[in-house]
Design a protein with these regions (language model features):
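N-terminal acidic, glycine/proline-rich low-complexity segments
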Residues: 1-177
Length: 177
């Protein structure tokens, strides 16, 4: 991917940009809401803070752990081999600590790796979009014109932007000031 080059700001301009905003702050929340629980709290807090924040939009972004699926399955097999004293079957590389800890957390909940749905990016974005709508519904706040679907995949090249309702809206809001 091509390197991004941002313009150099003067020290005064940098300090100005970093100052805490006064008054009502316009925000866009770009979130993978269905991925972890913290995003629901962020949306709820922002929505319930109209004296501080003006939510221009909440946009759903893609997420996926499908690229970790094989690693997680192998880590689970590795741990099962150790548990069953089948050490000789563990000839391949030791799984990463990341994968081992993930499997341990699953097992603590009584879940096997094969029971986990490893969604693709398009599914992750749609799950996030639906979760944002759920948060708005639970708060009894209308979502029409406020919640937008994002891209269905990750950016592969800076030269090939991915068009989505969210990206078009973000561009329009940036242009309108």
């Amino acid at each position: 991917m091509k390197e991004l080059k941002f313009p150099k700001l003067s020290k005064d301009k940098m300090i100005e940009k970093l100052e805490h905003p006064s008054g009502l702050t316009r925000i866009i929340i770009d979130t993978d809401t269905a991925n972890e629980i913290d995003d629901q709290f962020a949306i709820a807090w922002a929505a319930l803070s109209p004296e501080k924040l003006k939510i221009e939009a909440v946009t759903a972004e893609p997420f996926s752990f499908a690229h970790h699926q094989r690693e997680i399955f192998e880590a689970e097999q590795y741990l099962e081999n150790i548990e069953n004293n089948n050490i000789e079957k563990n000839i391949s590389e030791t799984p990463t600590n990341f994968a081992l800890e993930w499997v341990k957390r699953l097992h603590k909940r009584g879940t096997k790796a094969k029971e986990v749905k490893f969604v693709n990016t398009d599914e992750g974005m749609e799950l996030s979009y639906q979760e944002i709508l759920t948060v708005y519904d639970k708060l009894s706040i209308p979502s029409k014109g406020k919640v937008f679907r994002g891209s269905t995949s990750y950016l592969k090249s800076l030269d090939q932007p991915i068009k989505s309702d969210a990206s078009e809206l973000i561009i329009d809001l940036a242009k309108s000031g």
